[in-house]
Amino acid sequence: MKKLLFSLLMMIGVQASFAQTLEKMQWFNEPEQWEIKDKSLSMFVTPQSDYWRISHYGFTVDDAPFYYATYGGEFEVKVKVTGDYKARFDQAGLMLRIDHENYIKAGIEFVDGKFNLSTVVTHKTSDWSVITLDKPVPYIWIKAVRRLDAVEIFYSFDDKTYTMMRNAWLQDNIPVKVGFMAACPDGGGFNVKFENFKVKHLPDMRRLEWLKKNA
């Protein structure tokens, strides 16, 4: 009976996905202009907005648009991002957020005329890592995988081949707000579109190991 239960849990864990529609998500710092159409979210990003805490620049901001739902446990999330980036630091991508002192944002960021794969990890203070692209890209897929106390961040140009851009710590066993983030620290705003948003549940690794040992 225990072996049967373990097998069923494995099947459910692999196949399950969160039933989340864009309409049921919610805003933190709602922008003035946004629209949900054909299972995609488009917005005009609020000018002079960003997420950053203290380090290097000496200031803290927490006022950029973030459209999210809350998930617990382990999961994989991905989204396709298309943006009309114009000003320095224009950015868009995924965000995983526990609170104002603990979050990860990852995506495309426009810096000094170049497109960068950018990740900011914040625990009390923020750090920033970038991978500069050789040429502009019309769109990009960003994927995050939360396992135990770590989040792996990946990017792709075709939703087939994914390359890791960051592995970062994030407290486990606590719900996380997951969704679309866009910011415009220096400019007058820009248009961005998020589509093909998917969140897939992953079975808890520690629970599976316990079930395996106690089957």
Please describe what each predicted stretch is.
Residues 20-215:
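Extracellular glycan-recognition regions
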Residues 1-21:
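Bacterial Sec-dependent N-terminal signal peptides
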